A protein has these predicted regions:
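Short, polar/acidic, helix-capping and beta-turn segments at strand->helix junctions
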Residues: 1-118
């Protein structure tokens, strides 16, 4: 299930064989609420499932993702984030940056955006 934003942006934009995926958080697309009560592993799993659903809706898979940007409220969360992330990208993971930011919408602890080449 894809998240339906009320904000003026697309979840994904396809240009040729490149897909630009908008940022996703660890929210349940059925309720639009952040999950996990602060548990970064649960929130990461939901965010990556949301990313997976979006890239699949665009005709790709997680293996097509070539670049990921990760935004976290606390860089110390990255060890737990990486544990979950590695299960989604076990071999040849995409290029990636991770950065700490001050705040995210809806009380999220992380947001992930990506670029895929189909």
């Amino acid at each position: 299930m894809l998240f339906r934003s009320t904000a003026p942006y697309s979840q994904a934009v396809k240009v040729g064989n490149t897909v630009y995926l908008a940022g996703v958080c660890g929210d349940d697309p059925k309720t639009d609420k952040i999950v996990g009560n602060g548990d970064i592993k649960i929130e990461t799993k939901y965010a990556l499932e949301n990313l997976k659903n979006t890239v699949e809706a665009a005709g790709g898979t997680l293996k097509d993702i070539v670049k990921v940007n990760v935004f976290v409220k606390d860089i110390k969360m990255m060890a737990d984030f990486n544990e979950v992330y590695s299960s989604y990208f076990p071999e040849n993971p995409p290029a990636r940056i991770a950065m700490q930011i001050t705040d995210l919408a809806g009380g999220a602890n992380l947001e992930i955006d990506a670029v895929a080449v189909l």
